[in-house]
Amino acid sequence: MDAMAHWAADIPEYAITLARDFWPGPMTLVLKRADLAKDFITGGQETVGLRVPAHPISLALIKEFVAAGGYGIAAPSANRFGAVSPTTAQAVEDELASYLQEEDLILDGGACLVGVESTIIDCTGPTPMVLRLGAITPLMIEESTGLVALESNPSSIRVSGSLDSHYSPKAKVILDVVAVAGDGLIAPDQIPTPNGVIRLAAPSTIEEYARVLYHALRSADQQGLEVVVVLQPGGDGLAAAIRDRLQRSSSK
């Protein structure tokens, strides 16, 4: 909480409650920036996004910086703008190989545990507003804070993944149609694979769907597929976050 106050100002009580309930975890809080959060950190905005990841390697790295007198790490996402997000160290290397310098390091902590990006919550107003859906759902936010979590579309705050077209592979993504020979297919495991269709993923749970989605989309490009058919999951919560990513990936 001390680091929160270092980067952010006018922190509402419900933001502190969310931090206590869901950090470390896949949640980013957007807060009014403090004077120490300079433009090169905030992208020139009057807000700053704060997150405490749950991965033990990430936490260990942050603790090393704090032990040396720091207050955290300022860093962008490890992917090119608009492209499919990497969920493994190999995917990061594939994505950024031409930009990496000899002194650059990639920390390999295995595949991402959730798969889709963190929930982003705007905490600059009287109630929380969800700017990007993720594993921390609006219902979970409401149960934590006692406040109704609104969903913003669009927002005056620029956030990653808010454009209509995003998370897009080179292949064309088509939603909820019948796959034909030569297409790639991402669908729940109970859906059979038609003859000649390349099965990219067959998740059995919504959590597995989120974990394998981006890897499957990247695999389509690696195999040179032109079309990927994806059957969207139904339901609320994490399923809604997956549908959000799929609808953006199919909008190019």
Language-model-derived ranges and their functions:
Residues 1-252:
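Active-site-adjacent structural elements in enzyme catalytic cores
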